[in-house]
From Swiss-Prot:
Cofactor note: Binds 1 zinc ion per subunit.
Gene source species: Ligilactobacillus salivarius (strain UCC118) (Lactobacillus salivarius)
A cellular component term, taken from the record's GO annotations: cytosol
Matching SUPFAM superfamilies: Anticodon-binding domain of a subclass of class I aminoacyl-tRNA synthetases, Nucleotidylyl transferase
Phylogenetic lineage: Bacteria, Bacillati, Bacillota, Bacilli, Lactobacillales
Identification of the protein by name: Cysteine--tRNA ligase
């Protein structure tokens, strides 16, 4: 039974989508004014892993993730770079696709943009005004926070506590325009030099929170199965989305709320963020680290937990990933000398491991326990590859199951164009052990396996050297 931790109720709940077998999932996407950093990518990877697991479990997932292409930060960046808002956003949307593709994040069913949905945003705000949940003030439109009686139900914030801190979050001009300090902007009056659209309230642009309410309900319906994003979006962004959407439709906005943990950096485990200037972009990291290693590093921590970014943790991910790939290479190679038939006992034991994997992953996508099962699978591949007699059907059965499970983490051995250096070193070490133990059959197998991958070995008095046969 698949259970999710629902932030709305602060407990694990049995997952039952509105329509059996089909899942609607909305993930808050990036504001496209710069390259994404590792913290941004964590959200994309975490929810891609969850999506992959849902699909593995047989669900059809309609996965929508937006691009915020109108925002104060984008306008500021366009002015600093002397580029149009459109030029800035196109550049960094393309960069986002390149970076996430390198990390093997599946493309969303749809990536809607704010600019493309402006008419719907304006209509949505008009309904809120007509229903008395919003009001115009000097060209701005604000949401009446107190009118929505369930405000705070996601984050646990109390209206009285919010009121005490409201003055510290808004400037004096906003205070003068608002009927209540807690009200938030749905539409902002145009300022000189800013991009704007015509509306019933004059020229302006949407506030941040309204866009996700509009695009999620437009493309997925009034009630979504899963709404997801970073923990920093829980309040006020997701809280405001609920207020806007449920005021308009009168229906529950999202049934399950999932929030991923931060990526931290440094000795004090600070949250990685652009505002703190302590970030590492995926664009830069990809120049130094294999993308599969980055993906594995981020996809093997349970989504609600923080991840500590460090060279040591990346290296650990690389070592573990190489072990998984080596196991795959070892058993794949034995297809050459395998015989027809199968080994039922081996296949049953491996099938039981897959059941163990499902059991732990069904517990709120516990990838840390899940990857432990995968390591045991890799161990069993190595054990079987060492057998004197191996069966073709069993090898194919084990490899297909193994690949199917590993691909949930975004790792695809079939797409590897060449072996990682560490994988080569590991195979050479295994070959040296085989030679030491006078297991020359295994030693020759590893040599031939590497040769097929274009790796030439040279045994010297100082040890085994290798080079790529380009």
């Amino acid at each position: 039974m698949l259970q999710l931790y629902n932030t709305l109720t602060n407990q694990k709940e049995k997952f039952e989508p509105l329509n059996p077998g089909k899942v609607t999932m909305y993930v808050c996407g990036p504001t496209v004014y710069n390259y994404i950093h590792i913290g941004n990518a964590r959200s994309a990877v975490a929810f891609d892993t969850i999506r992959r697991y849902l699909e593995y479990r047989g669900f059809e997932v309609n996965y929508v993730s937006n691009f915020t292409d109108v925002d104060d930060k984008i306008i500021k960046a366009s002015q600093e770079m002397n580029l149009s808002v459109k030029e800035i956003t196109e550049k960094f949307i393309n960069a986002f696709y390149e970076d996430t593709s390198a990390l093997n994040v599946k493309k969303a069913t749809l990536n809607p943009r704010v600019m493309d949905n402006m008419d719907d945003i304006i209509k949505f705000i008009e309904v809120l005004v007509q229903k008395g949940y919003a009001y115009e003030s000097a060209g701005d439109v604000y949401y009446k926070t107190r009118k929505f009686k369930d405000y705070g139900k996601l984050s646990g914030q109390l209206i009285d506590d919010l009121e005490q801190g409201a003055s510290s979050r808004v400037d004096d001009i906003d205070q003068d325009k608002k009927q209540d300090p807690l009200d938030f902007a749905l539409w902002k009056k145009v300022k000189q030099g800013e991009i704007s659209w015509n509306s019933p309230w004059g020229q302006g642009r949407p506030g941040w929170h309204i866009e996700c309410s509009v695009m999620s309900t437009k493309y997925l319906g009034d009630t979504i199965d899963i709404h997801a994003g970073g923990q920093d979006l829980e309040f006020p962004h997701h809280e405001n989305e609920i207020a806007q959407s449920e005021a308009k439709t009168g229906k529950k906005f999202a049934r399950y709320w999932l929030h991923n943990g931060f990526v931290t950096i440094g000795e004090e485990d600070q949250k990685m963020s652009k505002s703190l200037g302590n970030f590492v972009t995926v664009h830069d990291l990809l120049k130094k680290v294999n993308p599969q290693v980055i993906r594995f590093f981020m996809s093997t921590t349970q989504y609600r937990r923080p991840i500590r970014y460090s060279s040591a943790n990346l290296n650990e991910a690389k070592v573990n990933l190489n072990k998984l790939q080596t196991a795959y290479e070892n058993l794949s190679y034995r297809l050459k000398d395998s015989v027809e038939g199968n080994d039922k006992e081996v296949e049953v034991n491996f099938a039981n491991l897959e059941k163990d994997f499902v059991k732990v992953m069904d517990d709120d996508f516990n990838v840390q326990n899940g990857i432990s099962v995968v390591y045991e699978m890799a161990k069993q591949l190595n054990v079987y590859s060492e057998k004197e007699k191996v069966y073709t059907d069993t090898i194919n059965n084990l490899i297909n199951t193994y690949k199917k499970v590993v691909e949930i983490f975004g790792i695809s051995f079939s797409e590897e164009k060449e072996l990682l250096d560490d994988t080569i070193e590991q195979l050479i070490q295994e070959r040296n052990e085989a030679r030491k133990n006078k297991n020359f059959k295994r030693s020759d197998e590893i040599r031939d396996l590497l040769k097929e991958q274009g790796i030439i070995l040279e045994d010297t008095a100082q040890g085994t050297r290798w080079k790529r046969n380009d």
